[in-house]
């Protein structure tokens, strides 16, 4: 009799992590809601499409609703699972109308300041808590960054921001197999180059 494959906390393949999370923590074979669907990269290798495929970019195909992840318009306590894969880079100016234009920054792959990133993440977590049923699952993919010459430990901040609404259920690390995006700056290196990202599994807990 074959032993079942052991689910590990570390993979270099995001599809293995997604499959592991779905196997261990999500009812059914996919998520109910993808808050930041994009081009649907999570579903390229056989994971079924979510019922609610949301994104702020109205030029994308296959989304079910154009909306901000902080204001989905879905009913309160109506879904069992949510996945959130927001931008993680700062100092992104591409196609912005101003350095503080948070909506435009999310649409074009990054934020200008860490405050902008923090605001978007916190409001999206609060919205996910609103639409999830008690004991529902929220999955967040994130990466720590160096911002303004300081390490911004995004995954630790997420745990703090979510603690009012969620319990930590599981944590996966994805090791990069290629060079990950980073600001293009010259000068002496001050921090270790980041070659991993986190997948945080949270469980909604109505207090």
Name these PLM-found stretches:
Residues 1-207:
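Class I S-adenosyl-L-methionine-dependent methyltransferase catalytic core
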